[in-house]
């Protein structure tokens, strides 16, 4: 009789500086959007787990906020979220941007140097550099730390992602299936819905507005005329930011609402009625009690 293949499973942390493509990679791996993306750094604020399942393997990818030096209570929360994600994982994927390789990566590499678990160097955005540039990039990182594997990919185009999964499978321990096959994230629906709304704010606004914004889902009620009713509040720090979010004659808030509703309907697979409110909460990023009330609690990390 042939030998039955053993089931493999494990937790994998996606770590790297802001805006290197961690959320894009996780969405690519999962095959559906579970983490928001934008061109702006610090898009991800919380640890978000995406779940990839095959017949003989399950990987729980933990997408972390990009590590950077803290300037506010929210920034400190985001750094701690990244570091705490390394406590109980089986493997770390340190993601870097091929276009900016070597610039400022020493800080993150220093955090990973002493880990006693495999660390992969994932070089993203290889579609934006010449193939001849890859070897010098790899050589430069070999001098920085000890990496089990070097994996060039393009998260946006999918290049190298299948090879990444095959390599992961070689390193993961034998283990059970932790989540049902149809689960793609460990986050509740209301959290993902709030992130979808925040993503559109990041995409549509500029300057200090995107990162001065938080979103809280007040309620998700079953069905008004066959639709899911979602009420959410957008918090900003200044009156001027509120005016920008609302826009002239409500034009901006309408755009945010329409785009968010479309993303939420794609995620949930049902029609949605979305209502948005905008409130000023001055200096909320420096208010630990308020941060905790909307889901950012350093003590839980």
UniProtKB/Swiss-Prot annotation:
Major localisation: cytoplasm
PROSITE patterns named among the record's database cross-references: G_ERA, KH_TYPE_2
Topology term for the membrane: Peripheral membrane protein
InterPro entries found in the cross-reference section: G_ERA_dom, GTP-bd, GTPase_Era-like, KH_dom-like_a/b, KH_dom_type_2, KH_sf_prok-type, P-loop_NTPase, Small_GTP-bd
Keywords: Cell membrane, Cytoplasm, GTP-binding, Membrane, Nucleotide-binding, Ribosome biogenesis, RNA-binding, rRNA-binding
One GO cellular component term noted in the UniProt record for this chain: cytosol
Superkingdom of origin organism: Bacteria
Span list, region G5: 153-155
Residues spanning the signal sequence: none
GO terms classed as biological process: ribosomal small subunit assembly
All residue ranges annotated as the Era-type G domain in the record: 8-174
Similarity comment: family membership: Belongs to the TRAFAC class TrmE-Era-EngA-EngB-Septin-like GTPase superfamily. Era GTPase family.
Protein's UniProt name: GTPase Era
Organism listed in the record: Lactobacillus delbrueckii subsp. bulgaricus (strain ATCC 11842 / DSM 20081 / BCRC 10696 / JCM 1002 / NBRC 13953 / NCIMB 11778 / NCTC 12712 / WDCM 00102 / Lb 14)
């Amino acid at each position: 009789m042939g030998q039955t293949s053993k089931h493999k499973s494990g937790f994998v942390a996606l770590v790297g500086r802001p805006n290197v493509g961690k959320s894009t990679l996780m969405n690519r791996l999962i095959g559906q959007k579970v983490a928001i993306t934008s061109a702006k750094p610090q898009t991800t604020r919380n640890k978000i787990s995406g779940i990839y399942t095959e017949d003989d393997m399950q990987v729980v990818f933990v997408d972390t906020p990009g590590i950077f030096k803290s300037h506010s209570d929210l920034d400190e929360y985001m750094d701690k979220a990244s570091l705490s994600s390394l406590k109980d994982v089986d493997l770390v994927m340190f993601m870097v941007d091929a276009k900016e390789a070597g610039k400022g990566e020493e800080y993150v590499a220093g955090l990973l140097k002493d880990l006693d678990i495999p660390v992969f160097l994932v070089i993203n955005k290889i579609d934006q550099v010449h193939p001849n540039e890859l070897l010098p990039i790899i050589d430069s990182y070999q001098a920085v730390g000890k990496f089990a594997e070097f994996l060039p990919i393009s998260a946006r185009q999918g290049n190298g992602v299948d090879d990444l999964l095959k390599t992961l499978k070689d390193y993961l321990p034998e283990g059970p299936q932790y989540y049902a096959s149809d689960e793609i994230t460990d986050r509740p629906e209301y959290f993902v819905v709030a992130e979808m709304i925040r993503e559109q704010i990041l995409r549509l606004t500029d300057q200090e507005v995107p990162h001065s914004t938080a979103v809280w889902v007040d309620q998700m009620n079953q069905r008004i005329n066959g639709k899911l009713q979602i009420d959410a509040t957008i918090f900003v720090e200044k009156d001027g930011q509120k005016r920008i979010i609302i826009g002239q004659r409500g034009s901006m808030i309408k755009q945010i609402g329409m785009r968010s509703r479309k993303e939420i309907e794609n995620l949930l697979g049902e029609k949605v009625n979305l209502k948005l409110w905008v409130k000023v909460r001055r200096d909320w990023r420096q208010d630990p009690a308020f941060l905790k009330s909307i889901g950012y609690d350093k003590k839980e990390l």
